[in-house]
Amino acid sequence: MYKKIIFSEFNSASKILKNFLEDKKQIENIQKAAILIAQSFKNEKKVISCGNGGSHCDAVHFSEELTSVYRKKRSGYPAISISDSSYISAVGNDFGYDQIFSRFIQSVGHLGDILLAISTSGNSLNIVRAIEEAKKKKMKVIVLTGNNAGKIKNLSDIEICIPHCGYSDRIQEMHIKIIHILILIIEKEMQKN
């Protein structure tokens, strides 16, 4: 009944993965991002992640895997996602939704920390403001994005961009795979002396 749809969906995802893998710069950027995050942990710094909607879920998942466990038991790593609903509703109400991430970074971000900003379109104003605030704090910025990276293009230290201009779910599927690979490499880097 729906087999054609199922095959079509998997084929579409496969093509996006294939196109991404052909861009060697993106593969290099994943490696650079993982090494940068591991180095920040070794320097007793933290990573702060943020995103909206499905990207918010990815940001939470990223910090959960780092503070808890991925594939093997190990010590937790200092990762925070900007996800507290009371905080988000308070700042959204008092200052505006565009400041929910930047005010958090203003409060807890420090030199040497890292911001992982996730946006499928690259056009969310609250993500742009988060990046700007992180730069003021002399934090390093890594972005996971899609399409053509939108307004956040060239604002980060490391940009990982999924070359897809269709539905955002395809970009999110790639983002979660990238997040898992980042964590895997971070763990390997943290085992080095």
UniProtKB/Swiss-Prot annotation:
Keywords, ordered alphabetically: Carbohydrate metabolism, Cytoplasm, Isomerase, Metal-binding, Zinc
Subcellular locations according to the entry: Cytoplasm
EC number of this enzyme: 5.3.1.28
Entry's Gene Ontology cellular component terms: cytoplasm
Domain of life: Bacteria
InterPro entries in the cross-refs: GmhA/DiaA (IPR035461), Phosphoheptose_Isoase (IPR004515), SIS_dom (IPR001347), SIS_dom_sf (IPR046348), SIS_GmhA/DiaA_subfam (IPR050099)
GO biological process: carbohydrate metabolic process; D-glycero-D-manno-heptose 7-phosphate biosynthetic process
Residues annotated as domain SIS: 37-193
Single GO term (MF): zinc ion binding
Main location: cytoplasm
Pathway per the UniProt entry: Carbohydrate biosynthesis; D-glycero-D-manno-heptose 7-phosphate biosynthesis; D-glycero-alpha-D-manno-heptose 7-phosphate and D-glycero-beta-D-manno-heptose 7-phosphate from sedoheptulose 7-phosphate: step 1/1
Cofactor note: Binds 1 zinc ion per subunit.
Annotated positions binding substrate: 52-54, 65, 93-94, 119-121, 124, 172
UniProt similarity note: Belongs to the SIS family. GmhA subfamily.
Note: The reaction produces a racemic mixture of D-glycero-alpha-D-manno-heptose 7-phosphate and D-glycero-beta-D-manno-heptose 7-phosphate. B.aphidicola is not able to make lipopolysaccharides (LPS), and except lpcA and kdtB, the genes responsible for the biosynthesis of the LPS components are missing from the genome.
Subunit structure as annotated in this protein's UniProt entry: Homotetramer.
PANTHER family: PHOSPHOHEPTOSE ISOMERASE (PTHR30390:SF7), SEDOHEPTULOSE 7-PHOSPHATE ISOMERASE / DNAA INITIATOR-ASSOCIATING FACTOR FOR REPLICATION INITIATION (PTHR30390)
Official protein name in the record: Phosphoheptose isomerase
Organism this protein belongs to: Buchnera aphidicola subsp. Acyrthosiphon pisum (strain APS) (Acyrthosiphon pisum symbiotic bacterium)
